[in-house]
Amino acid sequence: MIRNFKRTAAILGVVAAGSAALVACSESEEGSTDTATNGTPAAEVEGLSGTAGQLVGEGASSQQNAMDYFNVKYQEAVSGASLAYTASGSGSGRTNFVGGQVAFAGSDSPLSEDQVEPAAERCGGNDAWHLPFVIGPVAVAYNLEGVEELNLSIPTVAKIFKGEITSWNDEAIAAENEGVELPDTNISVVYRSDESGTSDNFQKFLQAAAPEDWETDGQQFPSAVGEGANGSNGVATQVTNIDGGITYVESGF
């Protein structure tokens, strides 16, 4: 999706749909129950009706809106309980979960191979589970004064984020937007500066859809082009304030 930011920039379409997972400890077989919780009132779920205090999690900023909603519903279901979530990024969330600082992590990417064993130790010898939790479409969003709609092919998107296309009236963009009056405004790339599952999913998509134009992968986005901002809200806010700005972000922002 290509989206024009006005505080919704402009989404050029969903380019990747990330399945954001919740990473948490499993129970031992001795501690497991056969109670089905789907649609069951909190008061009828064994051990839940007496729950109180704060459940603390950390991780993907793309999950912040969902976590805010879950907190409201959790408090409605369980009197005296609440959910606190710090949107520090997928990488930080997984690290602090493995370190025992939070009860769960929200992440757009699974635990790395070298985190699996420490996570099991942190969970008292039980496996850390990856539970599909939130579907977060990743969008390419731009802010370009006077231009409400744009079409950009995936190779063109890749070349923009690599710095090979640097002006909004570049012939490659013009060829894909016949009849659109494009200004000669410089393109300002904004990327996630923190370790991010959104960066990971976006780069995986570019590699798969435009392999000749994008080579890098991973949760750390290349910093050679543009400027970085922390978190989904950070990149969205930055592009909102820059005429000619472009970023990738979970579409809810």
Where do the model's predicted regions map?
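Bacterial N-terminal signal peptides that target proteins for export
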Residues: M1-L12
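C-terminal motif of bacterial Sec signal peptides marking the signal peptidase cleavage site
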Residues: S19-A24
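Bacterial signal peptide processing site
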Residues: S26-E29
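N-terminal segment of the mature folded domain
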Residues: G39-A174, Q238, V249-G252
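General small-molecule cofactor/ligand-binding pocket signal
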Residues: A84-S88, V190, E227
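Surface-exposed, Gly/Pro/Thr- and Asp/Glu-enriched linker/hinge segments
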Residues: P118-W129, N169-S188, G218-V225, N230-G231
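Non-catalytic, conformational "gating/processing" segments within enzyme and secreted inhibitor domains
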Residues: G179-Q203
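Ligand-binding pocket segment of bilobal, Venus flytrap-like solute-binding proteins
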Residues: E195-F253
